[in-house]
From Swiss-Prot:
Protein name, per record: Tumor-associated calcium signal transducer 2
Main subcellular localisation: membrane
Known tissue expression: Placenta, pancreatic carcinoma cell lines.
Stretches assigned to the Cytoplasmic side: 298-323
Alphabetized SUPFAM superfamilies for the sequence: Thyroglobulin type-1 domain
Matches recorded under PANTHER family: TUMOR-ASSOCIATED CALCIUM SIGNAL TRANSDUCER, TUMOR-ASSOCIATED CALCIUM SIGNAL TRANSDUCER 2
GO biological process, one term: negative regulation of epithelial cell migration
Gene: TACSTD2
UniProt KW keywords: Amyloid, Amyloidosis, Corneal dystrophy, Disulfide bond, Glycoprotein, Membrane, Sensory transduction, Signal, Transmembrane, Transmembrane helix, Tumor antigen, Vision
Cysteines joined through disulfide linkages: C73-C108, C119-C125, C127-C145
Length: 323
Protein backbone atom coordinates (compact mmCIF):
# COMPACT_ATOMS: atom_id res chain seq x y z
CA UNK A 1 0.00 0.00 0.00
CA UNK A 2 1.36 3.42 -0.94
CA UNK A 3 2.11 5.87 1.86
CA UNK A 4 0.55 9.26 1.93
CA UNK A 5 2.72 12.27 1.27
CA UNK A 6 2.56 13.27 4.93
CA UNK A 7 4.17 9.99 6.04
CA UNK A 8 7.28 10.12 3.81
CA UNK A 9 10.46 11.17 5.76
CA UNK A 10 12.27 14.24 4.48
CA UNK A 11 15.16 13.04 2.30
CA UNK A 12 17.75 15.34 4.05
CA UNK A 13 16.90 14.37 7.64
CA UNK A 14 19.27 11.36 7.83
CA UNK A 15 22.36 13.11 6.36
CA UNK A 16 21.72 16.10 8.62
CA UNK A 17 21.51 13.83 11.65
CA UNK A 18 24.80 12.19 10.68
CA UNK A 19 26.48 15.59 10.37
CA UNK A 20 25.26 16.61 13.82
CA UNK A 21 26.53 13.36 15.31
CA UNK A 22 29.90 13.81 13.59
CA UNK A 23 30.20 17.36 14.90
CA UNK A 24 29.38 16.30 18.44
CA UNK A 25 31.81 13.39 18.24
CA UNK A 26 34.53 15.62 16.83
CA UNK A 27 33.99 18.23 19.52
CA UNK A 28 34.18 15.55 22.22
CA UNK A 29 37.38 14.17 20.70
CA UNK A 30 38.85 17.65 20.55
CA UNK A 31 38.08 18.09 24.24
CA UNK A 32 39.68 14.74 25.04
CA UNK A 33 42.82 15.65 23.04
CA UNK A 34 43.08 19.17 24.41
CA UNK A 35 46.71 19.03 25.55
CA UNK A 36 49.89 20.95 24.80
CA UNK A 37 52.38 18.65 23.03
CA UNK A 38 55.35 20.95 23.67
CA UNK A 39 54.68 21.74 27.35
CA UNK A 40 53.20 19.37 29.90
CA UNK A 41 53.20 22.07 32.60
CA UNK A 42 50.01 23.66 31.27
CA UNK A 43 46.27 23.64 31.93
CA UNK A 44 44.30 23.17 28.69
CA UNK A 45 40.60 23.55 27.93
CA UNK A 46 38.46 24.09 24.80
CA UNK A 47 37.60 27.67 25.74
CA UNK A 48 39.44 29.35 22.89
CA UNK A 49 37.79 31.05 19.91
CA UNK A 50 35.30 28.66 18.30
CA UNK A 51 35.78 26.12 21.07
CA UNK A 52 39.39 25.52 20.12
CA UNK A 53 41.84 24.11 22.64
CA UNK A 54 43.69 26.79 24.59
CA UNK A 55 46.53 26.08 27.01
CA UNK A 56 47.87 28.29 29.79
CA UNK A 57 51.16 27.91 31.64
CA UNK A 58 51.06 26.97 35.30
CA UNK A 59 52.04 29.73 37.68
CA UNK A 60 51.68 32.65 35.29
CA UNK A 61 48.38 31.69 33.63
CA UNK A 62 49.68 33.05 30.33
CA UNK A 63 48.43 31.51 27.09
CA UNK A 64 51.16 29.56 25.30
CA UNK A 65 51.70 28.61 21.67
CA UNK A 66 51.78 24.81 21.65
CA UNK A 67 53.17 24.67 18.12
CA UNK A 68 56.58 25.76 19.40
CA UNK A 69 58.69 25.73 22.57
CA UNK A 70 57.55 27.67 25.63
CA UNK A 71 59.88 30.38 26.91
CA UNK A 72 62.27 29.39 29.68
CA UNK A 73 60.93 32.11 31.99
CA UNK A 74 57.40 30.67 31.91
CA UNK A 75 58.78 27.15 32.38
CA UNK A 76 60.73 28.12 35.50
CA UNK A 77 57.68 29.85 36.93
CA UNK A 78 55.60 26.75 36.23
CA UNK A 79 58.15 24.52 37.96
CA UNK A 80 58.09 26.74 41.05
CA UNK A 81 54.29 26.65 41.24
CA UNK A 82 53.77 22.96 40.47
CA UNK A 83 51.98 21.23 43.37
CA UNK A 84 54.00 18.58 45.17
CA UNK A 85 51.31 15.95 44.74
CA UNK A 86 50.89 16.47 40.98
CA UNK A 87 52.27 13.21 39.65
CA UNK A 88 51.70 14.12 36.01
CA UNK A 89 53.80 17.28 36.27
CA UNK A 90 57.55 17.75 36.37
CA UNK A 91 58.83 18.33 39.87
CA UNK A 92 62.57 19.02 39.78
CA UNK A 93 64.91 17.47 42.27
CA UNK A 94 66.89 19.71 44.58
CA UNK A 95 70.01 19.15 42.49
CA UNK A 96 68.40 19.91 39.10
CA UNK A 97 69.72 23.47 38.82
CA UNK A 98 69.88 25.73 35.80
CA UNK A 99 72.87 27.67 37.13
CA UNK A 100 74.96 28.09 40.28
CA UNK A 101 72.20 30.06 42.02
CA UNK A 102 69.66 27.26 41.62
CA UNK A 103 65.95 27.45 40.93
CA UNK A 104 64.00 30.65 41.62
CA UNK A 105 60.54 32.08 40.95
CA UNK A 106 61.10 34.51 38.04
CA UNK A 107 59.23 37.61 36.94
CA UNK A 108 58.23 37.38 33.26
CA UNK A 109 57.13 40.16 30.92
CA UNK A 110 53.87 39.98 28.89
CA UNK A 111 55.73 38.08 26.13
CA UNK A 112 57.02 35.43 28.51
CA UNK A 113 60.59 36.72 28.60
CA UNK A 114 62.65 37.27 31.72
CA UNK A 115 62.52 40.75 33.19
CA UNK A 116 65.98 42.27 33.54
CA UNK A 117 65.69 42.48 37.33
CA UNK A 118 64.76 39.45 39.44
CA UNK A 119 64.05 39.37 43.17
CA UNK A 120 62.59 35.87 43.73
CA UNK A 121 59.65 37.43 45.60
CA UNK A 122 62.09 38.86 48.21
CA UNK A 123 63.94 42.12 48.88
CA UNK A 124 67.17 40.71 47.42
CA UNK A 125 67.50 41.52 43.72
CA UNK A 126 69.94 40.93 40.85
CA UNK A 127 70.16 41.41 37.08
CA UNK A 128 69.82 38.49 34.66
CA UNK A 129 70.45 37.85 30.99
CA UNK A 130 67.92 36.63 28.43
CA UNK A 131 68.17 33.04 29.72
CA UNK A 132 67.58 34.05 33.34
CA UNK A 133 71.14 33.55 34.62
CA UNK A 134 72.46 36.11 37.13
CA UNK A 135 75.03 38.52 35.67
CA UNK A 136 75.54 40.98 38.57
CA UNK A 137 76.10 40.93 42.30
CA UNK A 138 72.99 40.71 44.43
CA UNK A 139 71.58 43.94 45.85
CA UNK A 140 68.42 45.35 47.38
CA UNK A 141 65.22 46.70 45.86
CA UNK A 142 67.04 49.85 44.74
CA UNK A 143 69.15 47.87 42.26
CA UNK A 144 68.66 49.04 38.67
CA UNK A 145 68.90 46.80 35.62
CA UNK A 146 68.68 49.09 32.60
CA UNK A 147 68.24 46.41 29.92
CA UNK A 148 67.81 42.70 29.37
CA UNK A 149 71.16 41.62 27.93
CA UNK A 150 70.91 38.92 25.30
CA UNK A 151 72.78 35.62 25.55
CA UNK A 152 74.08 35.07 22.02
CA UNK A 153 76.40 32.07 22.54
CA UNK A 154 75.64 28.89 24.49
CA UNK A 155 78.17 26.09 24.96
CA UNK A 156 76.68 22.76 26.05
CA UNK A 157 79.41 20.54 27.49
CA UNK A 158 78.53 16.84 27.75
CA UNK A 159 80.40 13.76 28.93
CA UNK A 160 79.10 10.40 27.74
CA UNK A 161 79.44 7.08 29.49
CA UNK A 162 82.27 4.74 28.51
CA UNK A 163 81.77 2.91 25.22
CA UNK A 164 83.65 0.20 23.35
CA UNK A 165 85.08 2.84 21.03
CA UNK A 166 84.78 6.49 20.16
CA UNK A 167 81.79 7.66 18.13
CA UNK A 168 82.36 8.76 14.57
CA UNK A 169 82.53 12.56 14.71
CA UNK A 170 80.56 13.09 11.49
CA UNK A 171 77.78 10.71 12.57
CA UNK A 172 77.60 12.33 16.01
CA UNK A 173 77.47 15.80 14.47
CA UNK A 174 74.64 14.82 12.13
CA UNK A 175 72.59 13.15 14.88
CA UNK A 176 72.80 16.10 17.28
CA UNK A 177 71.92 18.58 14.53
CA UNK A 178 68.92 16.43 13.59
CA UNK A 179 67.84 16.32 17.23
CA UNK A 180 67.85 20.11 17.63
CA UNK A 181 66.10 20.56 14.28
CA UNK A 182 63.33 17.99 14.73
CA UNK A 183 62.74 17.78 18.48
CA UNK A 184 63.45 21.38 19.51
CA UNK A 185 62.60 23.03 16.16
CA UNK A 186 65.76 25.11 16.20
CA UNK A 187 66.86 26.36 12.79
CA UNK A 188 70.04 24.51 11.69
CA UNK A 189 71.94 27.78 11.19
CA UNK A 190 71.89 28.35 14.96
CA UNK A 191 73.82 25.13 15.68
CA UNK A 192 77.26 26.60 15.06
CA UNK A 193 79.43 23.56 15.74
CA UNK A 194 79.67 20.14 17.37
CA UNK A 195 83.05 19.23 18.87
CA UNK A 196 84.08 15.77 20.05
CA UNK A 197 87.05 14.40 21.95
CA UNK A 198 86.07 11.17 23.67
CA UNK A 199 84.29 11.27 26.08
CA UNK A 200 83.56 15.03 25.85
CA UNK A 201 80.98 16.46 23.44
CA UNK A 202 80.50 20.21 22.98
CA UNK A 203 77.53 21.76 21.18
CA UNK A 204 77.77 25.44 20.27
CA UNK A 205 74.58 27.43 19.75
CA UNK A 206 74.88 30.98 18.40
CA UNK A 207 72.07 33.47 17.82
CA UNK A 208 72.38 37.24 18.08
CA UNK A 209 69.56 39.76 18.04
CA UNK A 210 69.81 40.52 14.32
CA UNK A 211 69.77 36.82 13.35
CA UNK A 212 66.62 35.87 15.28
CA UNK A 213 63.54 36.39 13.13
CA UNK A 214 59.90 36.27 14.21
CA UNK A 215 58.89 32.69 14.91
CA UNK A 216 62.45 31.43 15.43
CA UNK A 217 63.02 29.30 18.51
CA UNK A 218 65.38 30.98 20.96
CA UNK A 219 68.64 29.13 21.63
CA UNK A 220 68.10 29.60 25.37
CA UNK A 221 64.75 27.79 25.22
CA UNK A 222 66.17 24.99 23.05
CA UNK A 223 69.11 24.51 25.44
CA UNK A 224 66.75 24.38 28.43
CA UNK A 225 64.47 21.75 26.83
CA UNK A 226 67.59 19.73 25.94
CA UNK A 227 68.88 20.01 29.52
CA UNK A 228 65.60 18.74 30.96
CA UNK A 229 65.56 15.86 28.45
CA UNK A 230 69.11 14.83 29.38
CA UNK A 231 68.20 14.85 33.09
CA UNK A 232 65.14 12.67 32.50
CA UNK A 233 62.63 15.47 33.16
CA UNK A 234 61.21 15.98 29.67
CA UNK A 235 58.87 18.93 29.20
CA UNK A 236 57.11 17.41 26.20
CA UNK A 237 53.61 16.00 26.61
CA UNK A 238 53.18 12.29 26.00
CA UNK A 239 56.68 11.67 24.65
CA UNK A 240 59.06 9.09 26.00
CA UNK A 241 62.48 9.89 27.35
CA UNK A 242 65.26 11.06 25.10
CA UNK A 243 66.75 8.08 23.24
CA UNK A 244 69.96 9.29 21.60
CA UNK A 245 71.63 6.86 19.22
CA UNK A 246 74.53 7.21 16.84
CA UNK A 247 74.48 4.55 14.12
CA UNK A 248 72.31 2.44 16.42
CA UNK A 249 74.66 2.71 19.39
CA UNK A 250 73.13 4.43 22.45
CA UNK A 251 74.62 7.75 23.51
CA UNK A 252 74.23 7.95 27.29
CA UNK A 253 75.16 11.25 28.90
CA UNK A 254 76.42 11.22 32.50
CA UNK A 255 77.33 14.89 32.96
CA UNK A 256 76.03 18.18 31.57
CA UNK A 257 77.42 21.70 31.98
CA UNK A 258 76.02 24.73 30.17
CA UNK A 259 77.96 27.97 29.71
CA UNK A 260 76.36 31.24 28.64
CA UNK A 261 78.06 34.15 26.86
CA UNK A 262 76.25 37.50 26.74
CA UNK A 263 76.48 40.27 24.17
CA UNK A 264 77.62 42.57 27.00
CA UNK A 265 80.09 41.24 29.61
CA UNK A 266 78.65 40.62 33.10
CA UNK A 267 79.33 43.00 35.99
CA UNK A 268 80.67 41.25 39.06
CA UNK A 269 82.79 42.74 41.84
CA UNK A 270 85.52 41.05 43.87
CA UNK A 271 82.81 39.92 46.27
CA UNK A 272 82.06 37.16 43.77
CA UNK A 273 85.16 35.29 44.97
CA UNK A 274 83.76 32.26 46.70
CA UNK A 275 85.05 30.76 49.92
CA UNK A 276 86.38 27.80 47.97
CA UNK A 277 88.43 29.99 45.65
CA UNK A 278 89.80 32.00 48.58
CA UNK A 279 90.73 28.74 50.32
CA UNK A 280 92.62 27.58 47.24
CA UNK A 281 94.53 30.87 47.11
CA UNK A 282 95.43 30.58 50.81
CA UNK A 283 96.66 27.00 50.34
CA UNK A 284 98.84 28.03 47.39
CA UNK A 285 100.33 30.96 49.31
CA UNK A 286 101.04 28.80 52.37
CA UNK A 287 102.68 26.17 50.16
CA UNK A 288 104.91 28.79 48.54
CA UNK A 289 105.94 30.25 51.90
CA UNK A 290 106.66 26.79 53.31
CA UNK A 291 108.72 25.90 50.25
CA UNK A 292 110.77 29.07 50.52
CA UNK A 293 111.33 28.48 54.25
CA UNK A 294 112.58 24.93 53.63
CA UNK A 295 114.90 26.20 50.89
CA UNK A 296 116.37 28.92 53.13
CA UNK A 297 116.90 26.53 56.06
CA UNK A 298 118.56 23.95 53.80
CA UNK A 299 120.91 26.55 52.34
CA UNK A 300 121.86 27.79 55.81
CA UNK A 301 122.65 24.28 57.01
CA UNK A 302 124.85 23.63 54.01
CA UNK A 303 126.64 26.95 54.51
CA UNK A 304 127.26 26.23 58.24
CA UNK A 305 128.70 22.79 57.43
CA UNK A 306 131.17 24.24 54.97
CA UNK A 307 132.36 26.83 57.53
CA UNK A 308 132.94 24.13 60.18
CA UNK A 309 135.00 22.06 57.75
CA UNK A 310 137.14 25.07 56.84
CA UNK A 311 137.77 25.94 60.52
CA UNK A 312 138.70 22.32 61.30
CA UNK A 313 141.19 22.16 58.44
CA UNK A 314 142.85 25.40 59.55
CA UNK A 315 143.20 24.06 63.11
CA UNK A 316 144.89 20.88 61.88
CA UNK A 317 147.37 22.90 59.83
CA UNK A 318 148.35 24.94 62.89
CA UNK A 319 149.01 21.76 64.96
CA UNK A 320 151.46 20.31 62.39
CA UNK A 321 155.18 20.82 63.40
CA UNK A 322 157.20 23.12 61.27
CA UNK A 323 160.25 21.70 59.49
Amino acid sequence: MARGPGLAPPPLRLPLLLLVLAAVTGHTAAQDNCTCPTNKMTVCSPDGPGGRCQCRALGSGMAVDCSTLTSKCLLLKARMSAPKNARTLVRPSEHALVDNDGLYDPDCDPEGRFKARQCNQTSVCWCVNSVGVRRTDKGDLSLRCDELVRTHHILIDLRHRPTAGAFNHSDLDAELRRLFRERYRLHPKFVAAVHYEQPTIQIELRQNTSQKAAGDVDIGDAAYYFERDIKGESLFQGRGGLDLRVRGEPLQVERTLIYYLDEIPPKFSMKRLTAGLIAVIVVVVVALVAGMAVLVITNRRKSGKYKKVEIKELGELRKEPSL
